[in-house]
């Protein structure tokens, strides 16, 4: 299976956790790629504060580790995979904070990246927490497989964050802005 993610100016070796001698599954999906390509079009300052939700194996965290990154996930395996992939790519962990879904979110966030979870109650909890810390200057990009984005998903985004737009689908994934 492919373990090399090459997009824009990003070259990463990514593995699922635990790492196996023969990987059977890829550690990122087309939604990760779509998010990374979309963020590449933004002007992101060096010390930007990036908040990432539900980064399964660390593709987004590794891609933006040079910024002040806080990664929020309810999965211990995700936490372990993020640490493993940061080490695998010899990336600094100094500006990366990994926390669970119950911890308080940081203030003054410049960019929020959300991998939309399948559980709507988790998404609602995360959006409710997020609504208290984002400002009008915060850029929010959420992504998932197009088949996993429903009217109820969009309704939650609009309830907590205001008007939302969706992108065209690419590689069967879609973004919400």
Question: Where on the chain are the PLM-derived regions?
Answer:
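S-adenosyl-L-methionine
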Residues: 1-46, 56-60
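A short acidic, Gly/Pro-enriched loop at the edge of an enzyme's catalytic core
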Residues: 48, 99-116
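Conserved SAM-binding strand-loop segment of SAM-dependent methyltransferases
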Residues: 90-102
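Conserved SAM-binding motif I beta-strand of class I
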Residues: 68-74, 142
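Conserved S-adenosyl-L-methionine
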Residues: 64-70, 136
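A short glycine-rich, Lys/Arg-flanked "PGG" loop and its adjoining helix->strand segment in the class I
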Residues: 123-139
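Non-catalytic substrate-recognition/targeting regions of SAM-dependent transferases
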Residues: 1-20, 144-177
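Conserved SAM-binding loop
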Residues: 82-85
